[in-house]
Every structure is written in C-alpha cells, then in structure tokens.
Amino acid sequence: MRYDPAMQIGMLGLGRMGGNMARRLARTGIGVVAWDRASEARAALAGEPGLQTVETLEEFIAALTTPRVVWLMLPAGAPTDTTLDILAARLTAGDLLVDGGNAHYQDSQRHAAALAASGLQFVDAGVSGGVWGLQNGYGLMVGGEATAVARLEPVLRALAPSPERGWLHCGRAGAGHYAKMVHNGIEYGLMQAYAEGFALLQARPELGLDVAQLAEHWRHGTVIRSWLLDLTAEFLAQDPVLDDIAPIVADSGEGRWTAKEAIDLGVPAPVISAALMARFASQGRADYAARLLARMRRSFGGHATTPADKPPP
C-alpha cells in the first residue's frame, strides 16, 4: 500500500530497529526525515529513496512540517528521557512524539503527562519484529489518547505486516509499553522451554536423535510450531552443535520488569521468573552459589568436591 507522499514523519534513532523502520516507511511513500547522533547510522541510510537524512537535531526539527510527528527509537532510560526533554523545549504545541523504544510503562505515563502540560501529544509504542521487521512488518502495541493514535494510524498501518493486522491501540498512556513488557516476558518463557527441550534431545546421543531434523519436523502440524521454532530449525540445519557460542545469555530490562510486576501484583509467573533466573545463571551469577552448595555437601556428608581447574564430567 502506498501513502500520501505529503505525509511526513521524523525518525530519531537509526539503530538496528530504527533504521529499518525508516526504510519500511519510506518504501510505502511516507516522507521520512531521519537523524541519529552517530554519523555511521546516518550514513547507512544516506541515499535511500524517499528518505532524507540530516546532520543535526536542529536540522531535523526544521525539516519537519508542523504539526510534527517524531518517532524515537532510543534505549530506555536516560537517553530517551534526555531526548524527550530537549524536544519538548524545541517543538511546538500540537506536535506528536512517539516513544518506540522498550521503555518502562510508568516512564511512559510520566512522559505523557509532562508533554501534555506543554501541549504536546504522546504515544508509547511497543515494537516487536526484530531484524526481520523490514521484510515482514512489525507488531505494534500502542498506548495513548485516541486522537493521537488516530493521527498516527497511517504510520502504524505502513509498519505493520498488513494495514489491518499487526497493530493495536491497547489503551491509555503506558498501555503499549506494558503490553510489550509482558510480550517479552512470554518470549523469555517460550525460548527457555525450547532450549531445555533441545538440550534433552542432545543429551541422548545413543538414540540417534537429530536435533536439526526434529526442529524441522516440529514446524509442521505440531502444537509447538512457531516463528521461534522456524528460526531455530533454520540455524540448527547449519550448525546443530553451536560449540562456537559461549553459553551466556543476556537479559534485557523487560524480563526483569515482568517478573517484578508479577511480584508486585501477586500474580504467579513461575515460568517467566525461572527463565529469567536461567539467564542469570548463564551469566555466571550462580557460580558462587554452586561452589557454596558443593562445599556444604562436603561439610555435612563428606561428599567429594571437584577442583576448580578440572572440567566437569
């Protein structure tokens, strides 16, 4: 679907997500003005049809026709807070700001209230799709006033997998980022379940199980088929052993926020919480606890401990 080229949006933050989102919008005919403080990020988009990159924030603001629409794709916390403060001082009443980063929903509620006091509209947008979004479209969960979301609708329709599906006005300010937080918590649980299942398959070599073949087989007709499994089958077909990857899994803020939210609300979330703890353990955070456990067993039961310089059996 093509959109009115007179429609314009500013994309601020051109990393892996923001850069591809700018490309997708430009390819649908929406005029895009793009800026990032990093010159390499700007250079990567230079010359893209329908996309104008600028060198400074001042040029970025000046290039946008009023009332402006500015979409931020920045790390949560201080980078987003600082940028919103700067923009609030330079934009004019009636402009619309969209935070598409993985911000905490309470930060988004605070931003919405502060910007409204300056006459600015605000939408929080949880964005899912990763590096595949340019090709497949993005799943968008948005929060904010209905008038602001309606104004943003052509952009949401262009970014989504299809104009009618893949984006949702979830509720009031903060609702979009709350939905994205829970989405990422669910993602943690799903990924952990797949990882544990494939580890079990790998642990029984005497049965002749082929993890790559099973991953591909499970994609068709089974109750555990999913896009995550599609990706897993693809990389296992190339490298089923994965011995060049250290067994260390990073965790992002959303998994922690989801677990904390479950505690605050008294909502049982054992799978999400256990998946988060598994990531902590992979980062070496359980090493001291494991050593202490081994030493306790030796103290009360005389059980043997393994020397630190000896590899595990």
Name these PLM-found stretches.
Residues 37, 51-110, 134-143:
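Rossmann-like NAD(P)-binding element
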Residues 9, 80-83, 104-195, 201:
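Rossmann-fold dinucleotide-binding core
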Residues 32, 53, 122-123, 269:
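Hydrophobic beta-strand scaffold residues
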Residues 2-69, 94, 131-133:
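NAD(P)+-binding Rossmann beta1-loop-alpha1 motif at the extreme N-terminus of oxidoreductases
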Residues 141, 151, 164-167, 174-303:
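Helical "substrate-binding/catalytic lid" subdomain
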